[in-house]
Amino acid sequence: MKTLWIVAVWLIAVEGNLYQFGRMIWNRTGKLPILSYGSYGCYCGWGGQGPPKDATDRCCLVHDCCYTRVGDCSPKMTLYSYRFENGDIICDNKDPCKRAVCECDREAAICLGENVNTYDKKYKSYEDCTEEVQEC
């Protein structure tokens, strides 16, 4: 019941495609996205600076960079179509912005899944990110 409540609160709190991105992350990692990645390392969550703390954090930096590249598409608000098929995430969008945002999220979710073994609880709610922002 507690997990259901947490998921319900998370669904209410997200905006735009963040729910869609969260579903992709959950599918690839088995982790609740907002709890596991909402403030992980220096780049998972809002903002970011300093060197990534591990491969998981690097996935988030790459995702931030991807969102920067598609910034004119309002990536945090753009809703897109996708599906899970035979273990893959398929982006189903003819619109270039929707496809680009979906691909950013898809690649980040795959990266997080491939690096789930680098996830280290000591970087959850990590606050020592004081160095300069990493270049994309």
UniProtKB/Swiss-Prot annotation:
It is found in: Secreted. Residues 112-133 are annotated as: May be responsible for inhibition of the platelet-aggregation activity. It holds the Pfam family Phospholip_A2_1. Expressed by the venom gland. Its main location: secreted. The keyword Nucleus does not apply. Keywords: Calcium, Disulfide bond, Hemostasis impairing toxin, Hydrolase, Lipid degradation, Lipid metabolism, Metal-binding, Platelet aggregation inhibiting toxin, Secreted, Signal, Toxin. Optimum temperature is 37 degrees Celsius. The active site is at residues 63, 105. Its cofactor is Ca(2+). This is Acidic phospholipase A2 EC-I. It comes from Echis carinatus.
